[in-house]
């Protein structure tokens, strides 16, 4: 009896799926953080975790295996020279997935996948002071009437 493998197909053929996951993995290793759909992020995590574990061996054979999966010299160099050194003694769990709001347009579930040791501390959102709408909208009747009142009020004092 045929059994289904526990993996997402992502609506693609096997070759297209493999290329997509390879490209997402490459971009994650180069940029340290990417935004994609939740399903792609979860599948990318599986690939990246295995690649980083192989890279931790540091052998020439491991480097060739990783290059076979990524097909990008820059990403392989970044992985072996910088990422592996920074990860150090961490045993797995190299990535983190943060769920985001649904994408506008098709309401697809979105997520950010990032390398754990490269996560930036969240910065406080800039405080924006509210202005009177009449001041923001040039040429509005309210803005003109208020400016005339202020001019008239200055003359009375």
From Swiss-Prot:
Pfam families: Ribosomal_L17
PANTHER family per record: LARGE RIBOSOMAL SUBUNIT PROTEIN BL17M, RIBOSOMAL PROTEIN L17
Gene Ontology terms describing biological process: translation
Intrachain S-S bonds: none
Alphabetical list of Gene3D superfamilies matching this protein: Ribosomal protein L17
InterPro entries tied to this protein: Ribosomal_bL17, Ribosomal_bL17_CS, Ribosomal_bL17_sf
GO CC aspect terms: cytosolic large ribosomal subunit
Family to which the UniProt record says this protein belongs: Belongs to the bacterial ribosomal protein bL17 family.
Protein name per Swiss-Prot or TrEMBL: Large ribosomal subunit protein bL17
HAMAP family linked: Ribosomal_bL17
Gene name per UniProt: rplQ
Subunit comment: Part of the 50S ribosomal subunit. Contacts protein L32.
Coiled coil start-end: none
Region (Disordered): 124-157
UniProtKB keywords: Ribonucleoprotein, Ribosomal protein
GO molecular function: structural constituent of ribosome
